[in-house]
Amino acid sequence: PNKMIQKENVYLVGDAATQVKATTGGGIIPSLKAATTLCDCIINKKDYNKEFKKQSGRELLLHLKIRNVLNKFSDRDYDKLLGLMNQEKVKKILKKYDRDTPIPLVLNLLLREPRFLLFSKFGF
């Protein structure tokens, strides 16, 4: 997320710019968003580094933080997580919110099921 993605007239987009969701490895949506941002920056002479971070930096950083937490899980922790995820109230949230935008997803999960906070012991 702190990678420089523009230097003079050279621009990085997608995997080369680390614009991937660390939780899933997916990069199509972030890459398309970045390409749209880059077009706007070139046309309007804006700083692509700054504009991309403003638009998508927080979301990709949260994906990375979630991945770092999941990497510390034991099998027992995954069992607890799946137990929480299997509740109807949680399933409704998962259907409503897109995993490409984890901030509203995580906030709503925490509001509806505060026991997700137990996983914060792994660090955020």
Which residues fall in each region the model found?
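Structured catalytic cores of enzymes that bind and process phosphorylated ligands/cofactors
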Residues: 2-4, 9-11, 29, 33, ...
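C-terminal auxiliary extensions adjacent to catalytic cores
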Residues: 77-124
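Short FAD-binding loop at a beta-strand-to-alpha-helix junction that anchors the flavin cofactor
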Residues: 5-23
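Active-site-proximal substrate-binding core of FAD-dependent oxidoreductases
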Residues: 2-6, 24, 39-80, 84
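A conserved FAD-binding loop/helix module that cradles the flavin
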Residues: 20-42
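FAD cofactor-binding and catalytic pocket of flavoenzymes
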Residues: 1-6, 16, 120-124
